[in-house]
Regions:
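N-terminal glycine-rich phosphate-binding loop and ensuing alpha1 helix
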Residues: 1-43
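Generic hydrophobic secondary-structure packing signal
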Residues: 23, 45, 63-67
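Hydrophobic anchor at the start of a short beta-strand
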Residues: 35-36, 54-56, 85
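Conserved beta-strand termini and adjacent loop/short-helix elements that scaffold enzyme active sites
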Residues: 39-41, 57-59, 120-123
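Conserved beta-loop-beta/alpha segment of the NTase-like Rossmann-fold superfamily
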Residues: 64-133
Length: 134
């Protein structure tokens, strides 16, 4: 997910340098080898995705739910056997591949996963956050 409006950060934070690369490149690295698509309102993010060979959908729709819907509309016809989908905001630079894989493994091990929503939680408070998998 890369459809933020950059109101609080002042510029497109996904393009801000993090570890000598645009922040969004961390999400690309964590999701390497997975079926993925970036949904964005930003032409600059679109250009970065195209440069990196990442499928991208550019849109101008107003709601966060539009991002989810567009992503699913892209992925489901291409991967009909998909049993779940991770929604990963592009501004999660500390998310590791191991954490993402552990989340996917837990989801796949859940017998009732069709009715489950998996979210990472802040360890001390248990406050749910991103990414989300359902």
């Amino acid at each position: 997910m890369a459809s933020g409006l950059a109101k609080r950060f002042g510029s497109n934070k996904l393009l801000a340098e993090f570890d000598r690369k645009p922040l969004l490149c961390r999400a690309f690295a964590v999701t390497e080898g997975l079926h993925r698509v970036v949904v964005t309102r930003s032409t600059e993010v679109q250009a970065l995705c195209e440069e990196c060979g990442i499928p991208v959908l550019h849109h101008a729709l107003p709601f966060r739910s539009d991002t989810v819907r567009l992503g699913l509309e892209y992925l489901l016809p291409r991967f009909p056997a998909m049993s779940g989908c991770v929604f990963l905001p592009g501004d999660q630079p500390l998310l590791t591949r191991k954490t993402l894989c552990d989340m996917i493994s837990a989801f796949c091990a859940e017998p009732d996963r069709k009715s489950q929503i998996f979210r990472l939680c802040e360890p001390q408070s248990g406050t749910p956050g991103s990414p989300v998998l359902f």
